[in-house]
Swiss-Prot record:
It comes from the Eukaryota. The keyword 4Fe-4S does not apply. Residues 1-77, 94-123 are annotated as: Disordered. Signal peptide: none annotated. One of its GO terms (biological process) is spermatogenesis. PANTHER family: MALE-ENHANCED ANTIGEN-1 (PTHR17005). The lineage of its organism: Eukaryota, Metazoa, Chordata, Craniata, Vertebrata. Keywords: Developmental protein, Differentiation, Phosphoprotein, Spermatogenesis. May play an important role in spermatogenesis and/or testis development. This is Male-enhanced antigen 1. The modification Phosphoserine is found at S103. The gene is MEA1. Pfam families: MEA1.
Length: 174
């Protein structure tokens, strides 16, 4: 760890050592045979202020709102841009799969699947496994809100069914 020079004193990471030009008191003198107190190699002090490790330095950004405007290269046709991107992809050796063919049937299926979360296909055995697993789940008492303690399971199922029916009755907006 490098020593930092502050006001003529040299500070190390663990101790404060007096400068060699200062007079040492009788109890502070260096002892013969003491070597480097650290096993690390000494680091050179950074000569430039603000220079960090590996030579990086802080450079403030211009805060003036009147900056020079950067001129962007004119964009050509959409086809030219797409062709340029495809050329770059081929030059890099990348392959993108062809986009799927669009059809109205797929769009309707996707919208239906998004609006109806219960459309996950499960066989009866899987349904029973999910039911058994969920039956074993219990929330800690502080985790259950007061309104949930005041309503029975039958009442809650009725509320959920009404909410699902209302959701299915409203048209899906695209």
């Amino acid at each position: 760890m490098a020593a930092v020079v502050l006001g003529g004193d040299i500070m190390g990471p663990e101790r404060i050592f007096p400068n060699q030009t200062e007079e040492l008191g009788p109890h502070q003198g260096p002892t013969e045979g003491t070597g480097d107190w650290s096993s690390e190699e000494p680091e050179e002090e950074q000569e430039e202020t603000g220079t960090g490790p590996a030579g990086y330095s802080y450079q403030p950004l211009n805060q003036d709102p009147e900056q020079e405007e950067v001129e962007l290269a004119p964009v050509g046709d959409g086809e030219d841009v797409v062709a340029d991107i495809q050329d770059r992809i081929q030059a890099l050796g990348l392959h993108l799969p062809d986009p799927p063919l669009e059809s109205e049937d797929e769009d309707e299926e996707g919208a239906t699947a998004l609006s109806n979360h219960s459309s996950i296909p499960m066989d009866p055995e899987h349904v029973e496994l999910v039911k058994r697993t969920m039956a074993g789940v219990s929330l800690p008492a502080p985790g259950v809100p007061a309104w949930a303690r005041e309503i029975s399971d039958a009442q809650w199922e009725d509320v959920v069914q009404k909410a699902l029916q209302a959701r299915q009755a409203t048209p899906a907006w695209k």
